């Protein structure tokens, strides 16, 4: 299975439910602030990092900086997609290695 492709796409799309726009909707799809204050504060701190990171990137073909605020939803989803694909790949490697180890006993 190609974890790089499938994991990134699935992880990316699922993560949109928790990006700067998707997090505002509850389980029924209603616009509702369903996160407690502590969770929201932690989220804001983490998104500041992503906004800063991508806001400091200049697109060389046009020599213009990205707007980290405007692109945060996609940037959050991209990062989450990569992270979940990597985790799934790691689990597959561990599982495969355990099968090899057990078959050699």
Regions found by a protein language model. Name each.
Residues 1-5, 16-105:
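Zinc-dependent metallohydrolase catalytic domains
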Residues 9:
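P-loop NTPase nucleotide-binding module
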